[in-house]
Amino acid sequence: MLSLKSHYLCLFLSLSALSISHQTSAQKITLQQILEEGKQNYPFLKSKQAEIHGAESRIKSAKTDYLPSLIIQDQYTFATNNSVTGAFLPNEGSALSPSGGIRQENIYKGVFGSSTTALVDWKVFNFGKVNANVKAAKADIDRSKADYENELFQHQVKIVDAYLVLLINQKLVEAQQQNLDRALVFKQVTDAAVGSGMRPGVDSSLASAEYAKARLLLLESSRAEKVQRLRLSELSGHLEDNIQVDTMRFYSHLPTAMNTAPGFMKNPSLVFSQAQIDASYARSQAVRKSFLPSVSLTAAGWGRGSGVSNKTDAYRTDFGSGVSYQVYNYLFGISTRWNLTNILRVRNDYKAEQFQVERFKEIFNTQKLQLDRQTREAEMQFELSLEQARLTPVQLHAAQKAFDQAEARYESGLTDLFTLAQSVTTLNRAEVDKFITNGNAWRALLMRAAAAGDLSLFLNQLN
């Protein structure tokens, strides 16, 4: 019977050559590179940056309330000029105000007229209303920036986790490929032994079943790996089917334990929640002060022309006579405007904003409670994951030894194929466990960094 070890040696050499060729042909991307790609290219993060730019424009808009308003108007009309003593109400804000002498009869002969006005209105005292609006706009900028930083941090955590899961899946594909190679050797050797009459026919059937099972495991591992590649490339902002990642030092070292547990009060999600509280409070103050009056300095100048002479009351219906200015005026003054009945609306709006402040405070407390739990859970997970990762090499060594013994006994005819197949399954499970526990140790470290809100706790261990 052919030696199993000779078959393994040939397969090992061919797979090694194939692996080296594949590694040299594919350019691999590091974790730092894909983190930067995700930061620059992911569309949702770009939307948060646009939100910041919008908030910056709103604060510029709020600051324009410090400036005086200048309104210029120029108009040309064709109308009659009958008038009467008495008052009238405007028509939805438009006051139709004919100007002329009071006569006993109406004259329906229209003439052209012109009017040009310039009005400057400067709210020099507003009792803090403009300042409150500016502070609310600044608080909204801080909220938008905190929102972006939180989304960026959460996105980077997703990228790192997807990177680690892809590395695990890659290793699982390698493990299942090795398992398939072993199953193929068993099948070839067993078929030869059965054909020569050295082994019973049932061994050939068992070997075929184990080979089919190994192929199924490899196909499932390959499927999971391809799905994870797509997921990671999506997080980078560019979908790629064959993204290649660098294993870096994830499978040459285990993460080291930290002496003290990191805090979580600087977590970006808490910072964002606090910014929401501050922004809501600033809006409530702006609403409260909107009831206060304003004191304005006013200056105006205007000129008017008419087809009716201001000297002889003579009518001229030509356009040129109507648009030529006949009189000029100016005005300077100070005024106060205060809508006293507006207090009812402002009071309810202020209460609504106060409830919003209370809402964001409770959201902050909820997130604080969750992060406290996540921090403690991450500590526990990290310690257990490290312990598991240190034990799996022992498991793998024992499984390899058991496989070698079962292989030798099978070749000597001292045991059956079923016992050898069991040792192969145990060895495959040990290889898979080694890769999974190693990856889970790094993922547990990532969980600690995510709870603390500081990704450098993870990245610093890669240097």
Annotate each predicted stretch with a short phrase.
Residues 73-119, 249-253, 298-338, 342, ...:
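Small/polar, glycine/serine/threonine/aspartate-rich low-complexity segments that form flexible
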Residues 46-50, 63-64, 108-110, 124-152, ...:
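Sec/SRP-type N-terminal targeting helices
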Residues 194-198, 410-414, 451:
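A short glycine-centered flexible hinge/capping loop motif at secondary-structure junctions
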Residues 27-162:
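Short flexible linkers and secondary-structure junctions
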Residues 24-75, 81, 239-283, 339-340, ...:
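Bacterial Sec-pathway N-terminal export signals of envelope proteins
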Residues 71, 80, 433-463:
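Acidic, low-complexity, intrinsically disordered peripheral segments
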Residues 3, 151-266, 385, 427:
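Periplasmic alpha-helical coiled-coil/stalk elements that build and connect Gram-negative outer-membrane
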